[in-house]
Regions:
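His/Asp/Glu-rich acidic catalytic environments and adjacent acidic regulatory segments
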Residues: 111-162
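Phosphate-binding/switch region of NTP-binding enzymes
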Residues: 27-80
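Short, surface-exposed amphipathic charged segments that create phosphate/polyanion-binding patches used
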Residues: 60-67, 219-226, 288-292, 361-365
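C-terminal regions of RecA-like/P-loop NTPase motor modules
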Residues: 67-107
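Short, basic, glycine/proline-bearing loop/turn elements
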Residues: 21-25, 241-249, 481-493
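Substrate-engagement module of ASCE P-loop NTPases
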Residues: 2-30
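Conserved mixed alpha/beta core segments that line enzyme active sites in large multi-domain catalysts
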Residues: 30, 151-153, 158-197, 252-567
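A conserved helix-loop-beta module that forms one wall/lid of the active-site cleft
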Residues: 164-230, 234-255
Length: 567
């Protein structure tokens, strides 16, 4: 792509200069954008434009470093008699030269386009004529979606050419969209195709994708390439990571990339968005990278310039998270430390509604197509399980010491592990993650602080009364409602739980592997709901697992004895 070609020259030309050597690189006319050529002009010492007609060859110096003469930047004509280039000065000679330029420009009218865009435009033109070759599809999947053979097979099965073109239209830069984005769009296509009722309850997405080439462009344009190479050595893998992380947090984006960021933010207006990691290796078969890379909420309030600065800092945070110690260790332990890990980014509109000054989804969480957490002997693990919370789904993904998500096994969705109201209240979600539109930040609120802005119908779906606690208060002359989060009303909606079970079952069947998903659900007072499928990845399953006979263990050697439960 033009972005990566520009990066090549930005890295190579200074290196050749240090080596005190000379190298010539030919560029084919009309194959690259004006922007790409401008990046090369900025870094090279010498840039020559060469034109050839039937009998004439012209050379036009566009940049000559540290040298100047009165005729240097004139076009020069090649003489076949003596093999010399001489300046074109006469009126006749200049008219022939400009006629040649005009003829050549007619053959290359689209130099405002990236070479990658021209490839897609050509594929689109062929498709309108009823042609879409397997080679073209293979190129698109390889360069944009995934190189994993199992995922490629699924993409070919469920994607149409229109899907590829739509995805490209929503890309910033070029390169791959990464594992998380690929998993999200693929899961949606599978559900749209295989589950008839999915479309009626599916919340459409309007995500953008920052291509993986932008990650390398950011590194190169901030003069971090050699540091990146040093960090990828055995000696520098951990030791150079902190320095590279600091540089990634403080770099600047090229002007053409910033302009595309601004166009995207204008599209979203002041709707909150989330900037999510979507690396090459993320969310593929065998490597989930769960929680290793960052996702950053942008509440997206303020002036366009303020929103752009917040967004750029969020992208920097995601890029820098590739150098987090936990991510480096994860890659090292799995033998991925020598693999090229590039970071693409998935930008999604935050699903939800406004409640006073706060914004959040009705509920959110994660789902597993196979549940290893079985608290009743007759539960069906293959029915799947949901971890569901009120507000943003971070409480379902990131474990906290005070908050407990609601667990729902999908064969008995309303069943709970606790038998008393006191237990249900004690082991419930106490704090809600929301976006504060006044303070322009994500924050955690105690449930009681959020209650005044919640409508009654919403409370009935997500909350329960603690009648025992209310009675104790009444005995002391205190009359007030005591609420706690249970999601019982939502889980009593068989339409919702039935759809979630079908989504999990269908994805596992198509993937030929257990999966986990991230989702949000928004409801209204009529009981209608929409589900937003945010992520899907294959669950890692160990090949070394086996049945263990516990009867041979001596009683004195047992620390914990648990039956029909999980720990």
């Amino acid at each position: 792509t033009d972005l990566m070609m520009g990066n090549f020259f930005r890295v190579t030309c200074p290196y050749l200069f240090e080596l005190d050597t000379v190298a010539y690189f030919p560029l084919l006319r009309g194959r690259h954008s004006f922007d790409a050529v401008a990046r090369i002009r900025d870094t090279t010492q010498l840039l020559l434009d060469v034109y050839s007609g039937e009998d004439d060859i012209y050379l036009h110096p566009l940049k000559v470093w540290n040298r100047y003469s009165g005729q240097m930047f004139l076009p020069h004509h090649f003489s076949k008699k003596d093999g010399q280039f001489r300046p074109v000065e006469g009126g006749v000679g200049m008219s022939r030269y400009y006629q040649l330029l005009q003829n050549l420009s007619l053959n290359h009218p689209d130099q405002n386009y990236d070479s990658y865009d021209r490839f897609f435009n050509l594929a689109k033109m062929e498709y309108t004529r009823g042609i879409f070759s397997e080679d073209t599809e293979e190129q698109i999947i390889d360069s944009t979606m995934t190189k994993d053979e199992r995922l490629k097979k699924l993409v070919r099965q469920y994607f149409t050419p229109d899907d590829y073109f739509l995805l490209r239209n929503r890309m910033i830069g070029s390169g791959a969209i990464g594992g998380k984005a690929c998993g999200m769009v693929l899961a949606r296509k599978i559900c749209e195709t295989e589950i008839p009722e999915f479309t009626g309850h599916n919340e459409p997405h309007d995500s953008f994708y920052i291509g993986s080439d932008v990650f390398y462009t950011y590194i190169v344009s901030n003069d971090c390439w050699r540091l990146r190479i040093r960090q990828r050595t055995k000696e520098g893998y951990f030791s150079a990571a902190g320095e590279l992380r600091d540089h990634l947090l403080t770099g600047q984006f090229p002007a053409n990339i910033r302009e595309q960021f601004l166009n995207m933010l204008e599209y979203y207006g002041q709707s909150p968005i989330i900037v999510r990691s979507s690396s090459f290796l993320e969310d593929g078969f065998g490597n989930a990278f769960a929680g290793k890379y960052e996702s950053v909420f942008c509440v997206n309030q303020g002036s366009p310039q303020e929103r752009l600065e917040k967004f750029e800092q969020a992208v920097r945070q995601v890029y820098a998270s590739t150098m987090n110690y936990s991510a480096l260790e994860y890659r090292y332990q799995r033998g991925l430390d020598t693999r090229d890990e590039q970071m693409a980014i998935l930008v999604q509109r935050v699903s939800g509604s406004g409640y006073g000054n706060y914004f959040m989804p009705g509920a959110a969480g994660v789902g597993y197509s196979y549940s290893t957490y079985k608290w009743m002997p007759d539960m069906d693990s293959s029915a799947g399980m949901l971890r569901i919370v009120m507000g943003l789904g971070t409480k379902a993904v990131d474990r906290t010491s005070e908050d407990y998500p609601r667990l729902s096994n999908q064969d008995r969705p309303t069943a709970t592990i606790y038998s008393t109201t006191e237990q249900k209240h004690r082991y419930s979600q106490r704090n809600i993650d929301v976006l504060d539109c006044t303070e322009n930040c994500a924050r955690e609120l105690p449930l009681n602080q959020l209650l005044p802005v919640l409508p009654l119908w919403y409370k009935k779906l997500l909350l329960e009364h603690d009648r025992d606690a209310e009675m104790l208060l009444q005995q002391r002359g205190i009359y007030r409602n005591v609420w706690f989060v249970s999601c019982q009303g939502l889980l009593s909606n068989s339409g919702f739980t039935g759809l979630m079970q079908r989504i999990l079952h269908t994805l596992e069947k198509v993937y030929h592997n257990p999966v986990d998903i991230e989702y949000t659900v928004n409801m209204d007072e009529t009981g209608d709901f929409v589900v937003n499928l945010l992520q899907c990845r294959p669950l890692y399953t160990s090949k070394k697992s086996k049945q263990v006979d516990f009867s041979k263990i001596e009683w004195d050697d047992i620390f914990f004895d648990i039956k029909d439960s999980s720990m």
